[in-house]
């Protein structure tokens, strides 16, 4: 072995006095205070320093190799070893045999090795307690040290046997065996971690004895002393270069094998940790624990393993900012919502106000993102709804028209055989010409127009009822008073109390009358023919005036002709009953003509009134549906918000808002 600072400066003078083997060795040892460092073989993780006290050792040994003794001789010499492991020869002049000297040197070497092993084991145990992460490495090192110690002991035992057998050999053999013993001791001390630096200049058995004694003294002093604060690290290669069995290839192989084992252990630990950690979503920052696996002269490997049962950190997402361009209408809506939320905050407790404010902010931002539909979109929605309503109205109108036709067919009287044919024609005409629905926009129609139409419909109904009642009255009057001879009363109406002048009427009647006299039957026939001619002329005039309503007029003409025939039949019957009165009184003839004209006009008005009734019913339904539609959009039902623009304006106009409804 080699040391930087040798503990003793030795001066050795070797003199070969004679060829026979007389040797004298003198050693003078100065006593400086030095420090030695102990290092481990592969894992030099710790370093211990030992301070030595000053010592003085002077010894003179003289060997006489002239007389060689047998190895079997058991001679006892006066050699004494103290507790401090320093020896002194009582009889310095007396020389010891070689066998005993060699055995002593071997025993001392064994003691030194045992002491070094004990120190190394203690140091390793302390390191194991302090460094938990390096347990595996230290255990490996301890096992290596123990194996090396066992090898050293075996080598020493083998050397003992060799030395006992080789006592009869020359001095050169003795010195060679001493060299081997010293080399084995140096290798063992280097592998266990404690190295002592000794320069071997003399290779005689005396030097072996002295060096062994000095080593024993040094080891005992090392055990009793404390380590100083300052440490000196010794490189790995300096401890090994002086070893004769040193090979760099072997060291590199050992390092590679150690690193492979360490990596395998680390991988196994990481796999175990990963299997234990399950379902981890939230996290904290992992604490890095550095475990020193191997520290050699070439490289150091460190591994970072996360502590188990710790959660990885969450990926903090940076908030993305979106630009929102609110419109004027959305701002108005925001003002409303903000006022409502402020009123709600007053009722919330103080420990919840912060949370409620944050929620309100998020709510308002989301409300800003909601777009308000434009006017074009609203119009398209309204048009679709109107089209659906119109389809429904058309279906309803067709059903109503069919029902009215059936009811009119059943209610009409059938006096003659010709009447059913005429009714069938009327029903066909009504079905072929259905009433077209009124298509008018909502904005153009107001409440006033609706009222005007309703009033007109009501007045027309009242007129029809009055005219029908007047017809019945006039017919009853003619029957009653014509038979009793009370014609003057007929002329006196409630509006006219006096009898009107009848000169012009009589003159016209005289011109029309013929001078020839005829029987009663002939006169009645002539009068009936004249009345029929007048009715035909009136019908022609009405047809010319009403060119637009062709179908209606044709039906009315047929009805009028039937009515006229019925009237003529009745008149014939009445004339047969009261023939002399009618022939004498032309006023009655004029009244009958006027009544017939009124009946014709009423027959023309009735179908038109029916159409007006149907249109009025359709209009009423249309306005009922529109009123329901506007009620939904009014302030009465705030839950159904279909038109947000109008709602916002109405809400802004109303200061008091009931929050309970919302």
Curated annotation (Swiss-Prot):
Residues 1-94, 107-237, 288-328, 406-440, 506-580 are annotated as: Disordered. Residues 25-49, 109-161, 183-196, 213-224, 288-308, 413-434, 515-526, 535-575 have a biased composition (Low complexity). Residues 162-176, 203-212 have a biased composition (Polar residues). Residues 77-87 have a biased composition (Basic and acidic residues). Residues 226-235 have a biased composition (Basic residues). It comes from the Eukaryota. This is Putative uncharacterized protein DDB_G0292292. The lineage of its organism: Eukaryota, Amoebozoa, Evosea, Eumycetozoa, Dictyostelia.
């Amino acid at each position: 072995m080699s040391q930087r600072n040798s503990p003793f400066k030795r001066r050795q003078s070797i003199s070969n006095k004679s060829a026979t083997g007389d040797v004298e060795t003198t050693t003078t040892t100065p006593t400086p205070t030095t420090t030695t460092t102990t290092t481990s073989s592969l894992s030099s993780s710790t370093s211990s320093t030992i301070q030595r006290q000053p010592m003085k050792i002077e010894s003179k040994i003289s060997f006489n190799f002239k007389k060689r003794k047998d190895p079997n001789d058991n001679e006892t010499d006066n050699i004494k070893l103290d507790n401090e492991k320093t020896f002194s020869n009582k009889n310095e002049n007396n020389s010891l045999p070689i066998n005993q000297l060699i055995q002593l040197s071997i025993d001392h070497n064994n003691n030194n090795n045992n002491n070094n092993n004990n120190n190394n084991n203690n140091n390793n145990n302390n390191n194991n307690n302090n460094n938990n992460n390096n347990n595996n490495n230290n255990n490996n090192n301890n096992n290596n040290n123990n194996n090396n110690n066992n090898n050293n002991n075996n080598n020493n035992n083998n050397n003992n046997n060799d030395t006992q057998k080789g006592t009869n050999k020359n001095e050169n053999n003795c010195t060679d065996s001493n060299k081997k013993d010293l080399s084995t001791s140096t290798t063992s001390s280097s592998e266990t971690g404690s190295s002592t630096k000794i320069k071997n200049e003399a290779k005689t058995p005396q030097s072996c004895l002295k060096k062994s004694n000095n080593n024993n003294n040094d080891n005992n002093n090392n055990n009793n002393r404390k380590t100083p604060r300052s440490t000196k690290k010794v490189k790995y290669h300096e401890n090994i270069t002086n070893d004769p069995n040193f090979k760099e290839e072997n060291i590199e192989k050992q390092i590679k094998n150690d690193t492979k084992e360490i990596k395998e252990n680390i991988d196994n630990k990481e796999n175990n940790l990963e299997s234990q950690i399950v379902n981890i979503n939230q996290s904290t920052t992992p604490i890095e624990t550095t475990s020193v696996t191997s520290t050699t002269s070439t490289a150091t490997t460190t591994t970072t393993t996360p502590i188990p049962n710790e959660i990885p950190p969450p990926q903090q997402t940076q908030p993305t900012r979106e630009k929102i361009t609110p419109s004027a209408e959305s701002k108005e809506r925001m003002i409303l919502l903000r006022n409502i939320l402020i009123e709600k905050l007053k009722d919330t407790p103080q420990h919840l106000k912060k949370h409620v404010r944050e929620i309100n902010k998020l709510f308002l931002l989301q409300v800003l993102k909601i777009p308000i539909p434009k006017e074009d979109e609203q119009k398209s929605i309204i048009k679709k709804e109107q089209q659906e309503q119109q389809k429904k109205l058309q279906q309803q109108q067709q059903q109503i028209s069919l029902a009215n036709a059936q009811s009119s067919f059943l209610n009409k009287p059938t006096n003659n055989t010709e009447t059913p044919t005429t009714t069938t024609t009327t029903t066909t005409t009504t079905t072929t010409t259905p009433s077209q629905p009124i298509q008018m926009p909502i904005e153009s129609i107001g409440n006033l127009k609706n009222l005007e139409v309703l009033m007109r419909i009501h007045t027309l109904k009242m007129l029809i009822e009055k005219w029908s009642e007047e017809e019945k009255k006039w017919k009853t009057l003619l029957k009653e008073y014509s038979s009793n001879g009370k014609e003057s009363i007929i002329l006196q109406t409630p509006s006219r109390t006096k009898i009107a002048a009848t000169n012009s009427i009589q003159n016209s009647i005289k011109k029309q009358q013929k001078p020839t006299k005829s029987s009663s039957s002939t006169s009645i026939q002539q009068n009936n023919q004249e009345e029929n001619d007048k009715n035909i002329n009136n019908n022609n005039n009405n047809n010319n005036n009403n060119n637009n309503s062709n179908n209606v007029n044709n039906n009315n003409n047929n009805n009028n002709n039937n009515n006229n025939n019925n009237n003529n039949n009745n008149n014939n019957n009445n004339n047969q009953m009261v023939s002399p009165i009618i022939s004498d009184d032309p006023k009655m003839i004029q009244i009958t003509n006027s009544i017939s004209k009124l009946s014709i006009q009423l027959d023309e008005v009735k179908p038109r009134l029916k159409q007006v009734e149907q249109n009025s019913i359709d209009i009423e339904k249309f306005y009922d549906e529109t009123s329901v539609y506007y009620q939904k959009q009014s302030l009465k039902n705030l839950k159904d918000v279909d038109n947000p623009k109008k709602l916002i304006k109405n809400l802004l106009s109303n200061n008091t808002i009931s929050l309970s409804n919302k």
